[in-house]
């Protein structure tokens, strides 16, 4: 596999690709093949905490792909955490807490510039996805959404729950996330976040990249992150998001 055919390869497992992330650069003139890394880390280390890709979004990909053109000489490992194992490790009080109601992600999205200057004011956001509400502000050219989604996901073929979300991510890397709370508006206790992080560290796996490596990640079961690497590194990792896999009819 290489940069020129990885998209075609991933297409064999894909029913529909996810819409592109406009923060990332496109490759091979494709809106679905993107550079994985972008410099938004405020402390300039370019590390990233564990998260399920776009778990706060109206479109939550089923599969995330990574392809390595050039590994970093030092650092830059991709971290992985099995959400099923993490859920099993959490104490009962946390399980009861996250089972009782969904999370609420408050999202603000900068929209691409449009040539349609006739639209004014606000317009309701229409979606077929349960738990999504909000509106478009055409004068600000932004979308404001509230996304209700449980912190756990039922992995049907295994009859298990996976703890996969954005709760322990470094959310300064996600400027569109303005707040995360419970659906009721209740703030999530810092103590709970601390416990989740500690338990995730017990089972975290680090993938050391080699040229032409491919990772195909079940995004609703596994969370992933990235270890620190130098901004001057020639690390070149590409990413693709499969919104809906081809495994289902």
Give short role names for the model-derived ranges.
Residues 1-54, 62:
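N-terminal non-catalytic cap/leader segment that marks the start of a structured domain
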